Regions:
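Surface-exposed repetitive/solenoidal architectures
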Residues: 66-68, 90, 279, 302
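Eukaryotic adaptor/scaffold assembly regions
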Residues: 320, 324-326, 333-338
Length: 356
């Protein structure tokens, strides 16, 4: 007949059913679930119950650790549900599907809510249209590789999907704020608005370089596609987000995204990709200015494919091509030499039918 703390709940062994006497002043039971006395709060669900779980209608809150170590594979929320307390679905290693219902508007509350931490079988989720906010660390440390959002979502808080497996995401036009490190590791972001949500640079970039990861992130908007360096110093990412939020700065800032890369190679490769996919005079001028450095980089790496791709941009002068040919000869880069010879036959020095 005493109050049960969160720590006590987290340490409970698997139970197939929970029952209490009616005289208990704090709790009640229904369908084997431990509830608050008024039946509005789900305190503990029997973790030994497997398969599909339908949380009883009328429940408004699920407390911390309510489903810890649950054997459930699918969980369906009632439309009455409004609050998910931190860590309520921790370590649900068999959980594969969550249906959030039509009632809840905020997924996770408070600092570091970590709702689904280490749910290693949860690969895909859909956030329903009525949800406005996804809380801090809500899906931190999950196996999620695909998430679907709907219009109506306005905020995604810090670390919401950190340490997940998501590589591509589409963000609704209604999204106004996206917290830091909420989507690190992205390869591609599709925006349904030409205005980037505030915080996007801190949300998707990192200040720690990882091997075998692309240098840049593709951001597709309705009117244009841009490329942002994957690796940006944190202070520079904050500055970038501030500038992207100011309408009079935004267009020019997007043309200069490559310049925020934390290392010269990152800047150069992001600029090259930008010139290939969405050229503009700003990036063209920049690449001409640093072309000697770029050529030296590819020579040092013995990267003939990369160097030829750079030459194909058509921004090098005839003299620069001659100098590159000589350096390629010195380094034994025969494929580059052959390409330059073919390219120089074109009077414009840009278009060539030569293929590798």
């Amino acid at each position: 007949k005493s109050y049960i703390t969160d720590e006590q709940l987290s340490g409970w062994s698997p139970f197939p059913i929970l029952e209490l006497t009616e005289e208990n002043p704090y709790y009640s039971t229904k369908d084997g679930c431990l509830l608050s006395k008024d039946g509005l709060v789900l305190v503990k669900y029997p973790s030994a119950i497997s398969g599909t779980v339908h949380i009883p209608d009328g429940i408004e809150t699920i407390t911390s650790y309510a489903f810890i170590l649950s054997e459930a594979e699918e969980i369906y929320f009632p439309d009455s549900l409004r609050v998910l307390m931190p860590k309520c679905f921790w370590l649900c290693n068999k959980l594969q599907k969550v249906d959030f219902g039509h009632g809840i508007e905020e997924i996770g509350i408070g600092h570091d809510c970590s709702l689904f931490m280490q749910c290693s079988m949860l690969h895909e989720i859909e956030i329903p249209p009525q949800v406005r906010i996804i809380g801090e660390s809500a899906f931190l440390g999950t196996a999620i590789s695909k998430v679907t959002f709907h219009e109506g979502l306005t905020q995604i808080m810090d670390y919401a999907f950190k340490q997940s497996c998501i590589k591509e995401v589409t963000l609704p036009a209604s999204l106004k704020y996206i917290g830091r490190q909420s989507f690190p590791g992205m390869d591609s972001v599709t925006l349904l608005s030409d205005n980037m949500p505030y915080g996007i640079a801190e949300a998707i970039t990192s200040n720690t370089i990882q091997d075998n990861s692309p240098i840049y992130i593709k951001i597709k908007k309705p009117a244009a596609t841009v490329f942002m360096p994957r690796y940006i110093v944190t202070a520079d990412a904050v500055t970038l987000d501030t500038r992207l939020a100011i309408p009079s700065f935004r267009e020019k800032c997007e043309e200069l995204l490559y310049d925020y890369g934390m290392q010269p190679e990152i800047k150069w490769k992001t600029a090259i990709k930008t010139m290939k996919e969405c050229p503009n005079d700003t990036v063209k001028t920049y690449l001409r200015r640093v072309s000697k450095n770029i050529i030296a980089m590819y020579m040092e790496l013995n990267d003939e494919t990369g160097l030829i791709d750079f030459i194909k941009l058509g921004i090098m002068t005839p003299k620069a091509l001659d100098d590159t040919y000589k350096k390629a000869k010195e380094n034994g880069l025969t494929t580059v030499m052959a390409y330059i010879c073919e390219a120089q036959k074109d009077t414009k020095g840009s278009n060539s039918s030569f293929s590798l």
